[in-house]
């Protein structure tokens, strides 16, 4: 047992003199490992008489626990010191400015849609929606578009079959509203529409807002005043507006609406092709045939309708020269509209 006491004293002295964790690990292996000195002492129990083994074994276990306890305590001190040094080296200067979170923003097309809807709801219009997959009747027939009209061509319309297609305008929503409600009707119909066309000013899918007002004694002056006020509020400036005679199957009379170029104030530039004018929408008085097919008596009621491309207005408002930029999902472009 004297040898055991000497061995324990030697081990404790080695633990106290250790200068780092690596040295402690070597001491642990030397005294407590599988081939460690204290472990070897335990293996000598077989040489002792049977009656002495329990007592001697208990003493050896106490010795091992003592060395293990001191070694672990010393190890904990080194680990705490090492952690403190590491934390000190990696300290954060909380006075430095933080990165902050980048906030998102509405897509310019969404902004434009909301701006249009806000104006018309403010003057008493409701918002109506309808299916994007339409039948031939509501997309063409009910809007006085004859079978030989170019819009029915496969080159301009996406067909599923002979009767079902992707709507080419939001006018079917107007028809469905007139079929289900009695005048007076005041609605705008925002939504996605689809046409087989793609270039810098056209996309196979784009957004459109169409408006409809049906009531007694509605005339072209009401239409003219509504559109002029909308353009003034939307572009936040006084703009000259002109109505050019045009043709749409679902309105009579029909007109294209031009406004003074917002880029050059009507002086002529590349955007307006040196004319000083920009085409912004189509409009007209609702054709009697359209009213009649929707169950409204054209002798008693009249109305006007208009339609505008949302991307077109967004391009003019924000000075964007390629419609396809709106759908490229390039954050460098979209971040400009936050």
Swiss-Prot record:
Its main location: cytoplasm. Binds 2 magnesium ions per tetramer. Its EC number is 6.1.1.20. CDD domains: PheRS_alpha_core (cd00496). One of its GO terms (cellular component) is cytoplasm. GO terms for biological process: phenylalanyl-tRNA aminoacylation. It holds the Pfam family Phe_tRNA-synt_N. The keyword Magnesium applies. It comes from the Bacteria. It is an enzyme of class 6 (ligase). Signal peptide: none annotated. Tetramer of two alpha and two beta subunits. This is Phenylalanine--tRNA ligase alpha subunit. It comes from Pseudomonas fluorescens (strain Pf0-1). The gene is pheS.
